[in-house]
Amino acid sequence: MYQQEEYEVNNEGQEDVSKINALNLKWTLGFNFQLTDGVHNLTNEKRKEIFYPVAHTGVIYDYENNTQRLLQGHCNRITATAYCKFSDIIVTADCGPDSMLVVWDASTGIPKKTIFEPHPNGCQALDISQDGQFIVTLSKEANTDTDVQSLSLWEWNKDDEPCLITNEFDRRIKDYQYFVRFNSDDNTEFATTGKTRIVFWRREGEQKGFNYYSPGNIPSLKVLTQTVFIPDNTQVVTGTTDGHIIVWDISLIIEKVDTPKERRAIKLVDLMNKSKKPDGKKGSNSINILKIQDNYLVIGSSNGSIRFYDFQYRIIAWFEDAIIGSISNISFANTPMIEDNEDEDGFDDERKDKGENEPKFICPDFIVVDLDATITMLNYKLFEELDDEKKKGTTLMKSIVSPIIAMSCRPNSNVIGICCENGYLYEWNFQEKSSVLSILRVFDTDKENIPNCIDYSPDGNWLSVATKSGKIHIFDCKEKQWQNSVLEVSENEQGKPKVNMQVFSSDSKNLATMDADYAVSLFTIDHRQFDVNIPEKEWQFVGKHRIHHSEIKSIAFGESKNENDKKYYRLFSIGADMKMVEYEVLEIDYSKQKEKGQQINYIDRLKLKSIYPIEQETIPTACIWYPINMYKEDVLLTVNEEFKIKLWQFMKDNFKFCKKTCLGPIYGGAINKLLILNQNDAQNDYQDKYLAYSTKEKVVGIIKLPLEGNPNQTMGLIAHPDKITSISCSNDGKHFFSSGSDDYCVNVWSVNVQALEQIFATNPNEDPYPKLLEGGEDGQTHQDLKNFFYYSQIRSKDEHTTKARKLDGKVPLIAIPDMMRSMGYYPTNKEIENMQNEIRFSKYLDPGEQVEELDLNMFLKLFVNHRPVQGIGKSKIAESLNTLTKSLSDSAKEIAEQAKGQSVQPKTYNIDGIGEISLQDLKKILTTEGERMTNEEFDECLKILCGENEDQIPQQINVNNLCEDILGFEDLEGEERDDNIEDQYEDEENEEYDQD
């Protein structure tokens, strides 16, 4: 147990710029196709580029040269973007903690302005004025039903305070606003749109607020989408989900004196429910997108139609032959349009002959983005094109359309595999960087055959796809065909457990899986039907064990050598039950098949070897076979939820112990995935190596091996804004890959080994460990640590003697527990054993001796690496106490049911609903379970904590008296109170609201 006030965990995942240079983002696959108005056409006379957001990164993509410029800086997913053609600037914003609003130079990709926390929770939507001077932002609220939105106007290029006005919405509006748009003729006016209401805003002079009003005469049952201002006109148009537009105009009726002119709905026009051409697209016709391009109102619909109308709402042109899904954006190039005098086919002459005096339809090239993750380029001439194939336009990008489940890089190639929730399995060449993915297979999601993890074998010959229904599909990468027989981890037809992880052995001949039923299974490639006379080989099931009684967190193969120096494989699993299970992988000698009377068990090749508890208070999260093997050791590396990395040594006599415990990276949460970064050098026992890791969300990083407990030998950065599903790397370690989930993104990173070494290089004259203490090297904690160590030296030399003592700067290992407790860290007996073994066997395998003493530096390393990162607080004690009371309650009910045949609910909660336990029950638990105390030790501790007076000892123990009266903890965890209680309005849905 360890109570600590000031030691904090850095969950930001942010490192120095030099550390980020060690992992450079080189390419990002995918884009946020669901973000309305998120993609912009940057094409002009000098460039052919588009901008789109990917997770928390902006991308300027040159579709002519297939290159990317990456705009990095956001730590949350980008939720709003805008582009100003006049100023050639891009605006991006995100929502979440540490949100930002960034203005980028579109020609260079360099940020021109960064505004931190434009709103407390970031931006829902934004727009930029026609001249690029002003930005308007809508806040994103955590609870869209109860929280009040705000709207801000920014003059972003001001050197001082850029925010001009911030205004909260009137609670009576009762409609969350999703969209905002400037009036292109007047940058003091803009409109916001929700599902049922539109609000018009105007800034008057330099006053500190807005005039706004929300018209109430919206046609019933209309769900609104977007709003645009008609140029050189007072009319405004709002789209609806049923294919209509609502036309707003200045009201001619003055309702009361001094009421400003306000827009009212003057008509409802059906634009999309009737096709304007015989073979037009049918189906749902929601108006998703409204744009103004020159003299046209442009509409993009949910059925993939693009239509151009004049400002009398008469159709001029339509594009309905391209294979386009529900549209999320339309964006036009910034190129001057010069109408040809005559087409190649003489079309203009034909128009004149027919007496058509209307100007010919013309517009810049434009891109269309749909919800099928496709970006299509269209040209205005396609409207009059007769060839159906040519009318489909040019596909610039066809990307990932479903959340990513898993990703893996194929060794000895430039291909990565990606599987998604919709059952699609893709392959993508990261050297060619194609904008269109290659589909390897589509799994039938109706049969719950959705892939859950994919992995290539180390030799690159096999691809294993494990599904949520317990099936394993094997793909032969050389022959380009799937194995006919499908492997299964369970024969029970009623419930097929989901395969959560799979791993190949280093020789690519064994495949191990762990599933949701807490079982570990083994498959191997062997002769069909295990008949040596059949030359064909296939993957087959050869063993299974269900040892864990809780979720398995990770599995790993290890390599060892027997007495004959022959290599064999062992398999390890770690689980939420805090246990490590070791299995031996048996090999079959087919020469015995011919021996008379010899019976061979071809199936049972996974032999249970040992079960060992590796944690007491925290859950292990990942494991990997330790690749550093200078002394021919067998070592497994594990990590846990408390940010600790442990090395477990396996001796020849099946003896195992914790060789070392190190503080791991503490940014971004606990590590849940590990891999060797430079796998080509994995067999080199002496070369420095690197472990790549990922946390459950946001952070990936690198750990330098061998582990020394040096905090300078780890780095991490924000790779994704949310969940990370997979990490992988190329065999040479030069490319590292990470995949998100519903950000539809795979990031390709280049690894700079030289930069890594510069990062991890430690000044020999600088001790990094004191910096991990509160106050650093000159702080009180470091001084206390030295004082307690020196006092331990005196005690070890007999503190009561009057003779001169000769201190040699070392203390015996038996002094470790008292020194740790004096520093406020109360280790368990097992933790004490681990610390003593770490010192005792630190030199054992080199000269063959055991170390029985430690110096000050050793003690400092032990303390910073073993103590809990987060101290024990009242909430954690309450959680533990509730666990005990629940356990007692369940036990009492079970006893009562057995004795009387009925359930009895024992009293384990007081009148305030706080879990409590009697003093006698607490004593029984502490003296009979876990690391047991004796009765005398319990009584002695209670007297020390509560005093000699037995009346001061409470007979019922709850979290309050245990923490405050017995343990003397300070209440460091303040409770949050919401004192901001505002009145609620209950107004009619169509009531109008004004503010002057």
UniProtKB/Swiss-Prot annotation:
Gene Ontology CC entries for this record? 9+2 motile cilium
Its primary localisation, in coarse terms, equals other
Is Repeat among this UniProt entry's keywords? yes
Q: From the Swiss-Prot or TrEMBL record, state where the protein is found.
A: Cell projection, Cilium
Alphabetized, the UniProt keywords read: Cell projection, Repeat, WD repeat
Q: Which InterPro entries match?
A: EF-hand-dom_pair (IPR011992), Quinoprotein_ADH-like_sf (IPR011047), WD40/YVTN_repeat-like_dom_sf (IPR015943), WD40_repeat_CS (IPR019775), WD40_repeat_dom_sf (IPR036322), WD40_rpt (IPR001680), WD_repeat_EMAP (IPR050630)
Provide the residue span(s) of the region labelled Disordered: 971-996
Q: Where are the WD repeats?
A: 73-114, 118-164, 168-211, 219-258, 282-319, 399-438, 445-485, 494-533, 547-593, 615-658, 719-759
Keyword Secreted assigned to the entry: answer is no
Disrupted gene: resulting phenotype? Knockout cells show deficiencies in cell multiplication and ciliary functions. Mutants move with greatly reduced velocities, have disturbed waveform of beating cilia and have stiffer cilia. Mutant cilia lacjk an arch-like density of the radial spoke 3 base.
**Gene Ontology annotations of biological process type:** cilium movement; cilium organization
Q: Which branch of life, at top level?
A: Eukaryota
Q: What does this protein do?
A: As component of a spoke-associated complex, regulates ciliary mobility by mediating a stable and functional assembly of the radial spoke 3 (RS3).
The protein, known as? Cilia- and flagella-associated protein 251
Q: Per the UniProt entry, what species is this protein from, by scientific name?
A: Tetrahymena thermophila (strain SB210)
